[in-house]
Amino acid sequence: MSKEVNEERTPRTVEDVKEMLTKHSNGEIQRTIQNCITILQNDHVLADAIRLNLLSERIDIVKPVGWPRSGKTLNDTDMKYILRRMEKYGISSEKKIESAIRIVANENRYHPIRDYLNSLKWDGTERIPHVLYHFLGAAEDEYTCEAMKIFLLGAIKRVFQPGCKFETMLCLVGGQGAGKSTFFRLLAVKDEWFSDDLRRLDDDNVYRKLQGHWIIEMSEMIATANAKSIEEIKSFLSKQKETYKVPYETHPADRLRQCVFAGTTNRQDFLPRDRTGNRRFIPIPVDAELAEVHILDDETESRTYIGQLWAEAMTIYNRGDYKLAFSPAMQETLQAHQQDFMQEDAQAGMIYAFLEDYTGDRVCSKQLYAEALGNTNIPAEWETRSICEIMNTGISRGDIQGWQAHKTAKRYPKYGVQKGWERVTSPETGAEDFSEITDAEAKQLGFPF
């Protein structure tokens, strides 16, 4: 680990630093990387200025260096000034100076969010159960409290343990102007740690848009997703790292995720009807009219409140008595909330209605495709797979009662050999219309489930 860059240094003149450098026998300063490092560490302008930011994975200049600049990140103009400074020592090899800068920065690495979180002192007042009501008018109940706690602790853990498993998205649902996006921006503490620039997941630069950010808002992205894109979003949220190379690198490297994702939407039916589960998305309805304050009424006070919110979360994190998931009982509450925000599943409704009036003992996916959904063509594989998901999920959730999946495939008069579903207590009548086939035959036919 690097020595503390804040330790007291005796200011050294250029002549003092020259005395520290290795020289040729004729007294000329050697143009080595090590001499460049010595200059960068001891020159009164450059000493303690160059550090590697572990959040952005970029090199920062963290103190005034005597030339006009904006922002912290080292840029091309900074390099020109540094090269000019190094010429005072008779060194002008840009390649060696750049190598020395990377070494010095790496030995003086820091993480701005870790430093911020570790500096906080909690005043002992609980804010996690109340913050979403305070600023956004959300319900003050156990579900909202647990959702907020999971999100905060997930964000903290991602910073201290980059790449940890955390695939939960807190989704704020409410009218325009409620302050949803502003809440997440202020929650990120610094605007540079927040981003709402992630619009497409198929963008070649999508992973670079995560770099240097802590909280990333995905506004309306879920609400506009189709069946294919929602799977892409779920897969994207589940990733723990990205692999790519930045311009100065020769080889790609793994970048462990340090960010979390937040959703905002105005739509009440923003969740797609996902029959395999929407566990990653935690919807929280908000109502600005019920909020105690609008988050921008007094931004300074709001930021102070949020600072104490993080201090409270850090206290919980340091104790270690937390989980980044709902309890089984609260998971049921989550599923009930998700149902309130799900889009209508027309196909499932048609199949459920068909089964209510159906008098037969067995059905298969092709039969439901034709008779329940009214299609006359031969279904594609993905269409039969979708019907299988409707049936199997409906049975497991109790939406479809009195039915169970076949243990073996059976031959249907109109539809051939199919796997399907049968009534749990079926009479013997009509059984002669079906005949069982072996598991080998079923495997050979390649059924969708």
Predicted regions and their residues:
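N-terminal nucleic-acid engagement/recognition segments and initiation subdomains in replication
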Residues: 1-127, 142, 146, 377-382, ...
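AAA+/SF3 P-loop NTPase mechanochemical coupling elements
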Residues: 206-211, 246-264
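Conserved catalytic/switch belt of AAA+ P-loop NTPases
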Residues: 230-253
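Conserved AAA+/SF3 P-loop NTPase catalytic/coupling segment centered on the Walker-B
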Residues: 215-237, 272-277
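DNA transaction DNA-binding modules
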Residues: 324-449
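A short helix-turn-beta junction within AAA+ P-loop NTPase domains corresponding to the substrate/partner-engaging
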Residues: 271-292
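Long, low-complexity, charged/polar intrinsically disordered regions in eukaryotic proteins
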Residues: 304-337
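P-loop NTPase catalytic core of nucleic-acid-dependent motor ATPases
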Residues: 101-211, 366
